[in-house]
C-alpha cells in the first residue's frame, strides 16, 4: 500500500526492508514481533487515502476503518485504516495541517502507565526533537517538526524501535546522559555504528515499557 502514498522502497533484503523513514525487520527469538502499534502515514489528498485503503483491502489485508471523516480528531481529519499481518494498525491520513516534510503523520503506542511514560518522553524529548503538547489521565501527546507521537493507556505496545534524528553527535550524547542519569535503562551507549553506514552515530535507551528509543546523527551532508 505504501506506493500509493508516494513511499518508494529505499532498501530491501531478506532481513530488512525500508521506505524512507519507516522500516520493517524480520522478527527473531532475540527480537520478537511488534504488537499493538498504530502508525499513520501522510496522504497528500483524500483520494490518496481512499487508494491506500482500497489497495490494502483488495490485497486481502484486514479493514480497520473505511476511509472517511473522523471529526473526533479534527474538523478536516480524513483517515482510512488497515491491519498488518501482525495486527498492527496502519492508517493513511489527510488533514489541512499535515506536514509536507515528513512521511509519518503520527505514531501511537499503548503503555501500562501514562504518567510514567510521559515522564520518560519529557526527559528525552528536548534531545529528540519533540515536546509535550497536551496530557490527560489516559493520553499524552508530543509534537515535533514533522508529526506527533502519543502514549495511550492500554495493553502495552511491544517491541517497538523508534529512532529520532539529531543535528550533531553532542545531541546524541546529551540524550543518553539525560535518560540514564534519570534512571532509565541503557540499551547502547553513544558511538559510531558502521554496520548501518559510515558516520552513523547513535545511542539507545529503553522506555518504561521496554521499547527501544534511539537518537541518531547520520553525519551526512
Would you name each region that the model predicts?
Residues 20-23, 33, 75-77, 143-149, ...:
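A short, glycine/Asx- and small/polar-enriched loop/turn
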Residues 25, 30-33, 88, 147-151, ...:
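Short, charged/polar, Gly/Pro-enriched secondary-structure boundary elements
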Residues 81, 91-98, 197-198, 204, ...:
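Short beta->alpha transition motifs characteristic of CBS
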Residues 1-23, 108-148:
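Core segments of cupin and vicinal oxygen chelate
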Residues 40-86, 112-115, 163-209:
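Vicinal oxygen chelate
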Residues 39, 93-119, 129-131, 162, ...:
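N-terminal beta-strand motif that seeds the catalytic metal site of vicinal oxygen chelate
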Residues 30-33, 99-102, 154-156:
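Short, flexible turn/loop "capping" segments at secondary-structure junctions
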